[in-house]
């Protein structure tokens, strides 16, 4: 997917992968994984290893930042999974380098509490 997307997602990218469940659930997991904080290791050892190997493979493509060449095509690969039945849907979501993440809590009195 990353090879086919080429420079369209403005590398360096974050790759989110959702495996299993229904396809709409796999797609949602992939999008959620894009927002997982950098450096957060997957608690599942098999998935942590898969993330590491995929990141190395993607970076070996040589696209580099903004397609100028180099070994940083992706900054992170994050994977999640769900139980599945007779078929195994897989969804991949790509996000550009300017990934933004924040959160907020809206209180009854109208105040907003922001946090990362």
Question: What does each of the following model-derived ranges do?
Answer:
Residues 1-116:
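Non-transmembrane, aqueous-exposed alpha-helical and coiled segments at domain scale
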